[in-house]
Amino acid sequence: MPPSTSRLRGEILIVLALSLGMSALYAIVGFSRRLSIETPLNEQQATINRSLADESIFDLVYQLLGIASAWAPVLLVGFLLWSSQKPHLGALGWSAPRWPDLWWGVGLAALIGIPGLGVYVAGVQSGLTVQVVPTALEQYWWTIPVLLLRALTAGVVEETIAVGYLYRRLSQLAWSPVAIILTQAILRGAYHLYQGAGAFVGNVAMGLIFGWYYHRTGRLAPLIAAHTLIDAVAFVGYPLVSADVVQTLGFAG
């Protein structure tokens, strides 16, 4: 028996309150606070990955705990949409991976990442975007593996919930594909608003492209691959780029 409309709405609110919806609220409040201070946006900084303890072992433990907790909403929506028939998570766009998914992911990463860098630079130069620090982690033996794991986590969490889960549940509420894609895109922009208005615009555009792709294919793997690749390049590549290039691109050094 399919869930009632009121139950679906309540479920969506709970899932978002435990994940990206709450992140969006924090980002909106954070952006409002940034606007309230005298320092221009493009002179402020937003650090994505930071050290959580002075001691290497405790920093690692905290990082892994943070990653594990981020996966909890994914497990929740997987539990809610699990089917006894294969593919068990087909309602979320999860099915057996295929090699073309990887190549589509690379293509989508290039389509989003290259123009996205331009949007970021333009946003910083115009004063609409803060200087982003992709990582401020100390250099330990575990730093790169943790950064890659964080990139994968961001890809899985955001695409599973913002795209796969919302598309399924909002479709059950008889929303049109256009309304669903717009909602997904605005949500994606909202929880990136802590980086400034430029990041909001860029991520809304990313959400529109990803939403359209999912509407046409119903496959989540290429989106996860693309998102993971974009974040992995930013997180791992940032410390390897010279200070001059970092400053030219508008990243905080």
Q: Where are the regions a protein language model picked out?
A:
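Helix-boundary and loop/linker segments of multi-pass membrane transporters
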Residues: P2-L8, S51-L52, G93-R98, V133-W142, ...
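Residue-level signature of transmembrane alpha-helical entry/exit and packing/kink sites
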Residues: R7-V15, D59-A70, P100-G105, T143-L147, ...
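Transmembrane helix-loop-helix hairpins at the membrane interface
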Residues: L20-A24, G113-L117, V121-G253
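Interfacial segments of alpha-helical transmembrane regions
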Residues: A91-I114
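N-terminal, membrane-interfacial amphipathic/helix-forming hydrophobic leader that caps
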Residues: M1-L89, F235-G253
